[in-house]
Amino acid sequence: MRRITVLGATGSIGQNTLNVVSRHPDDFQVFALTAHSQISAMAELCVKHNPQYAVMGSYNAAAELKALLGQQTSTQVMYGDQALAEVSSDAEVDVVMAAIVGAAGLSPTLAAIDAGKDVLLANKEALVMSGQLFIDHAQRSGARIIPVDSEHNAIFQCLPQAAQQQVGTMALAEHGIQYLLLTGSGGPFRDIPLEELPQQTPGAACNHPNWSMGRKISVDSATMLNKGLEYIEARWLFNCSRDQLKVVIHPQSVIHSMVQYTDGSVLAQMGEPDMRTPIAHSLGYPERLESGVAGLDFTQIAELTFKQPEAQRYPCLQLAIEACWEGQWATTALNAANEVAVAAFLQEQVGFTDIAKVCDSVLQSIQADEADSLETLLAIDKQARLAANKWLQEYAQ
């Protein structure tokens, strides 16, 4: 019986994780669930899974949850950053699903890493912001990182077993690997005329053709900044050089990523676009767990197509690739600027193509040395958010 903490339990990844966990009651026990402010959704999860602890983002949210639960469960309700760190690092916890969206997920995920847990990494921003620092912490503590993002999980599955034991430190060439190929659908706007991009609405951006995701990640998919963040994450997870990492658009989302070997072989992980598959893989690794996902019916796949992403259509992707090799300060600043810009777009304060403009402006304005501590990274994050908000204020005038 393995005890699990789910960070970001009310989100898409969190709920899919609990869906898989509930299929294996003899293998998993829910130790703690966390959420920011989704009180009613959290109450339902607490009643269903009866965690030992539930953590909310604020005192008021915790008080409301406690009142709503009443005597229905024995769950102890807590709130705040310290409580997040505690349920991530508690001695009773075996596995932590790191699924808090955004920079807010970094600190509790690092707490789990420092405590030597098995960390199922679904939070892109942890590696985007902290990169080498994150990997160094895992090396020191002996924590095991298993990627959950469909693309990184796909690559992980296609690696030799020896490389799977060296997340963050592997030498790809020593394992006969030429390069890694990240696939992306291209989002809902991949085929519309470029001149129509500025008019696209939040509703259209969130209408992903293949995947069911949260609103923020759906917008990131539309700009392909999501793929840019995954590119940065892959650089750190698999210790890539620039020529060992490529991105290709694959509209059908059947192949989730590929590994090109030096002998000419290509290994690809395929499956239905359902996050329960990589979640089940990460939960069960190295064994396989039933996930509830139907197998692929190859007779129903009409075609598998691929193309290069257009720089004009996806400027956010290009910004992310350049930031990846510029330094940790750049990826941290880009992530922060994007979070601010996407939030403004979802509130219809800026247009779709303004997201890239905000990100580019912030990267141009920030002067930073290499980030070598969590405090420095958080300071850069704050500086970038201030710069992004300044851009938005000037835009509104």
Curated annotation (Swiss-Prot):
Binding-site positions, Mn(2+): D149, E151, E230
Gene Ontology biological-process entries: isopentenyl diphosphate biosynthetic process, methylerythritol 4-phosphate pathway involved in terpenoid biosynthetic process
Entry keywords, A to Z: Isoprene biosynthesis, Manganese, Metal-binding, NADP, Oxidoreductase
Reactions accelerated catalytically: 2-C-methyl-D-erythritol 4-phosphate + NADP(+) = 1-deoxy-D-xylulose 5-phosphate + NADPH + H(+)
Named cofactor requirement(s): Mg(2+); Mn(2+)
Any one Gene Ontology molecular-function term assigned to this protein's record: manganese ion binding
Annotated residues for binding of 1-deoxy-D-xylulose 5-phosphate: K124, S150, E151, S185, H208, S221, N226, K227, E230
Top-tier EC class: oxidoreductase
Residues reported to bind NADPH: T10, G11, S12, I13, Q38, N123, E125, G214
Protein name per the record: 1-deoxy-D-xylulose 5-phosphate reductoisomerase
Pathway: Isoprenoid biosynthesis; isopentenyl diphosphate biosynthesis via DXP pathway; isopentenyl diphosphate from 1-deoxy-D-xylulose 5-phosphate: step 1/6
EC number annotated for this UniProt entry: 1.1.1.267
Family in the record: Belongs to the DXR family.
Source organism superkingdom: Bacteria
Record function comment: Catalyzes the NADPH-dependent rearrangement and reduction of 1-deoxy-D-xylulose-5-phosphate (DXP) to 2-C-methyl-D-erythritol 4-phosphate (MEP).
PANTHER family assigned: 1-DEOXY-D-XYLULOSE 5-PHOSPHATE REDUCTOISOMERASE, 1-DEOXY-D-XYLULOSE 5-PHOSPHATE REDUCTOISOMERASE, CHLOROPLASTIC
Entry-linked Gene3D superfamilies: 1.10.1740.10, NAD(P)-binding Rossmann-like Domain
HAMAP family listed in its UniProt record: DXP_reductoisom
Pfam families found in the cross-reference section: DXP_redisom_C, DXP_reductoisom, DXPR_C
SUPFAM superfamilies named in the record: 1-deoxy-D-xylulose-5-phosphate reductoisomerase, C-terminal domain, Glyceraldehyde-3-phosphate dehydrogenase-like, C-terminal domain, NAD(P)-binding Rossmann-fold domains
InterPro entries referenced in this protein's UniProt entry, alphabetically: DXP_reductoisomerase (IPR003821), DXP_reductoisomerase_C (IPR013644), DXP_reductoisomerase_N (IPR013512), DXPR_C (IPR026877), DXPR_C_sf (IPR036169), NAD(P)-bd_dom_sf (IPR036291)
